[in-house]
């Protein structure tokens, strides 16, 4: 009889221990959203705008590597709030500004707060980020270079054709 009473309490004790351990494990693993919120805070600190920006929406977390030190690609939008930077208020406590600026952000974050690695660029929709402008300029240069090489090859081909035509005897 004593054994039967101890089994449920043993089961309860193990279940509570397991839940406690799982809770500790989850509380130490930072979330994707938390990493993005840290990136938004970093954006607010670096931004030259006078008002704070707040997370508007966030694309779902990409599946893959579970290592919190591995950078994860992110894509989200922020919107200007009514709070000025000088007020030193948390963006989450600020209302969105009517007709506030919305910026599309993309880049990479690490989930580990100790590493706190962000590579984020935010721009208004329709505006190209600086690094994309560099790539488009490079593409233009490559296209022009390819056209010049094509023209040179065409001239070389014509010279070769002319050379062989001169070797063929002409009928008199």
From Swiss-Prot:
The keyword Disulfide bond applies. Transmembrane segments: none annotated. One of its GO terms (biological process) is defense response to Gram-positive bacterium. Proteolytically cleaved by cathepsin CTSG. Keywords: Antibiotic, Antimicrobial, Disulfide bond, Immunity, Innate immunity, Secreted, Signal. Residues 28-134 are annotated as: Cathelin-like domain (CLD). InterPro entries: Cathelicidin-like (IPR001894), Cathelicidin_CS (IPR018216), Cathlecidin_C (IPR022746), Cystatin_sf (IPR046350). It is found in: Secreted; Vesicle. Residues 28-134 form a propeptide. Pfam families: CAP18_C, Cathelicidins. Residues 1-27 form the signal peptide. Disulfide bonds join 83-94, 105-122. Expressed in granulocytes (at protein level). High expression in bone marrow and small intestine. Expressed in testis, spleen, stomach, and intestine. Very low expression found in heart, lung and skeletal muscle. No expression in brain, kidney or liver. Belongs to the cathelicidin family. Antimicrobial protein that is an integral component of the innate immune system. Binds to bacterial lipopolysaccharides (LPS). PANTHER family: CATHELICIDIN, CATHELICIDIN ANTIMICROBIAL PEPTIDE. This is Cathelicidin antimicrobial peptide. It comes from Mus musculus (Mouse). The lineage of its organism: Eukaryota, Metazoa, Chordata, Craniata, Vertebrata.
């Amino acid at each position: 009889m004593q054994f039967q009473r101890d089994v449920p309490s043993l089961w309860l004790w193990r279940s509570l221990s397991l839940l406690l351990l799982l809770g500790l494990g989850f509380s130490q693993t930072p979330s994707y959203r938390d990493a993005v919120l840290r990136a938004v805070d970093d954006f607010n600190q670096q931004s030259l705008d006078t008002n704070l920006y707040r997370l508007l929406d966030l694309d779902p977390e990409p599946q893959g590597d579970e290592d919190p030190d591995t950078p994860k690609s992110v894509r989200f939008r922020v919107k200007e709030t009514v709070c000025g930077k000088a007020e030193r208020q948390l963006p989450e406590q600020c209302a969105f500004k009517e007709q506030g600026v919305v910026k599309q952000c993309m880049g990479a974050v690490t989930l580990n707060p100790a590493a706190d690695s962000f590579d984020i660029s935010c721009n208004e929709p329709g505006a190209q980020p600086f690094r994309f402008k560099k790539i488009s300029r490079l593409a233009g240069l490559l296209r022009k270079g390819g056209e010049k090489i094509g023209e040179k090859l065409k001239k070389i081909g014509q010279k070769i054709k002319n050379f062989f035509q001169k070797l063929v005897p002409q009928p008199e």
